[in-house]
């Protein structure tokens, strides 16, 4: 962002990390970047915890990701695309009444479970019956109570098991 114009360089602050893109969120590291000395002086006034809560491993992993991680990033993106398509195809084959779509630039599928008649909280029902956990749709608004969020940034084995557990719990 800071490179798009002189105005962006003068007033912009970029907050970023390698966490999501390179799938290293558990390593706790982020960056706050400015190209303006006055903004840097204001950023320097932030509480010390802001500067020192990153892990040393996260800092090294982030540096490696940004410097040499293009191949890794492309591999992660390819894997996520494969997992997304696999989830979509498994749902179509095993749970055709579950509505979903192929997400873009995400690793989360939004599943409409309303046709399964799982009660007021489908996520809780599936946790109890199938021992599979999802983010409950109601957390995203009253209109989403029959939805669950499925994070597919995991192995195909785990994704297949999760969908099989839904099928077995019905």
Regions found by a protein language model. Give the residues of each.
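Conserved core segment of the aminotransferase class I/II
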Residues: 5-81
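PLP-dependent enzyme catalytic core of the Aspartate aminotransferase-like
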Residues: 8, 121, 125-134, 140-170
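Short, flexible turn/loop "capping" segments at secondary-structure junctions
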Residues: 23-24, 101-103, 141-144
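Short amphipathic alpha-helical segments
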Residues: 27-28, 105-107, 146-148
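Short hydrophobic/aromatic beta-strand micro-patches
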Residues: 33, 110-112, 151-153
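Helix N-cap motif at beta-to-alpha junctions
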Residues: 36, 115-116, 155-157
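Conserved glycine-rich beta-strand-loop-beta hairpin in the small C-terminal domain of fold type I
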Residues: 63, 79-88, 99-113
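A short linear hydrophobic-aromatic micro-motif
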Residues: 88, 97-100, 133-138
């Amino acid at each position: 962002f800071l490179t798009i114009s002189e105005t962006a360089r003068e007033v912009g602050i970029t907050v970023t990390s390698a966490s999501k893109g390179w799938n290293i969120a558990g390593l706790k590291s982020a960056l706050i970047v400015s190209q303006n000395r006055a903004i840097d002086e204001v950023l320097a006034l932030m509480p010390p915890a802001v500067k020192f809560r990153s892990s040393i491993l996260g800092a090294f992993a982030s540096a490696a990701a940004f410097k040499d991680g293009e191949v890794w990033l492309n591999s992660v993106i390819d894997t996520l695309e494969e997992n997304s398509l696999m989830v979509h195809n498994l749902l179509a084959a095993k749970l055709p009444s579950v509505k979903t779509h192929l997400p873009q630039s995400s690793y989360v599928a939004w599943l409409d479970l309303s046709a399964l008649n799982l009660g007021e909280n489908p996520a809780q029902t599936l946790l109890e019956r199938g021992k599979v956990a999802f983010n409950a749709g109601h957390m995203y608004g009253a209109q989403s109570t029959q939805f669950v969020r499925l994070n597919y940034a995991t192995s195909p084995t785990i994704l297949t098991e999760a969908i099989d557990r839904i099928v077995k719990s019905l």
